[in-house]
Regions:
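Membrane-embedded alpha-helical segments and adjacent helix-loop junctions characteristic
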Residues: 1-59, 65
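Juxtamembrane/transmembrane-helix boundary motifs in multi-pass membrane proteins
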Residues: 16-20, 62-65, 99, 103, ...
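Small-residue-rich segments of transmembrane alpha-helices in multi-pass membrane proteins
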Residues: 22-26, 80, 143-147
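Hydrophobic alpha-helical transmembrane segments of polytopic
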Residues: 24-28, 67, 164-167, 171
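Alpha-helical transmembrane segments and, especially, the helix-loop junctions at the ends
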Residues: 32-49, 63-103, 107, 112-126
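Long, contiguous bundles of hydrophobic transmembrane helices that form the permeation core
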Residues: 106, 110-178
């Protein structure tokens, strides 16, 4: 984070969300899931909250839907991140029972991501997500309490941001292969 790698990843994630806004209910949890997988902590999801809210509002979708799915997705991803303490601990418990680290990572990645996407599908199909029909939002909008969209935030990246992400990913790969 100090080298600017997280800012770089958030910038990429924001571009993904803004380039496909109508799929916010699926992309928001996907983005937070993979940020957590890469970082090993769910705190990375906090940096995505303002972007998710803006994109959802721009698509006339209640922000609570993609936000809640995204936050849950980031927390579930901790159980599949090769660099999280939870995975290291569970691997230590399960390896004596015959489960290898690569097998567990593969299993946890597939099942946790599938669960997140299934949840996003259920919310998208069965929840009332139309923001224009939300009386509380419409009242706040009429009172001028809703902030206008600020658009893409191109934050100046630190010089070593991209390199720090590359080095970190190589480290994660080495951990996986070890």
């Amino acid at each position: 984070q100090l080298a600017g790698g997280l800012d770089y990843l958030v910038q990429i994630a924001e571009r993904i969300l803004r380039s496909n806004p109508k799929y916010i209910n699926f992309l928001a949890p996907t983005v937070t899931y993979f940020l957590t997988i890469l970082a090993g902590t769910g705190h990375t999801a906090f940096s995505m909250i303002p972007v998710i809210v803006e994109v959802a509002k721009e698509q006339n979708i209640k922000p609570s839907a993609p936000l809640s799915i995204a936050v849950v997705s980031s927390q579930i991803a901790i159980t599949a991140s090769p660099v999280s303490a939870a995975v290291v601990y569970m691997t230590g418990v399960l390896e004596p029972l015959g489960w290898s680290y690569p097998t567990l990572i593969g299993l946890w990645l597939v099942t946790t991501f599938a669960g997140c996407m299934l949840t996003a599908l259920i919310i998208t199909l069965f929840a009332n997500l139309d923001l224009s029909k939300d009386p509380v939002y419409q009242e706040r909008l009429a009172q001028g309490l809703v902030k206008p969209s600020t658009g893409v935030q191109n934050k100046e990246l630190k010089p070593g941001a991209k390199l720090s992400v590359a080095i970190f990913l190589i480290g994660v790969l080495l951990v996986l292969l070890y």
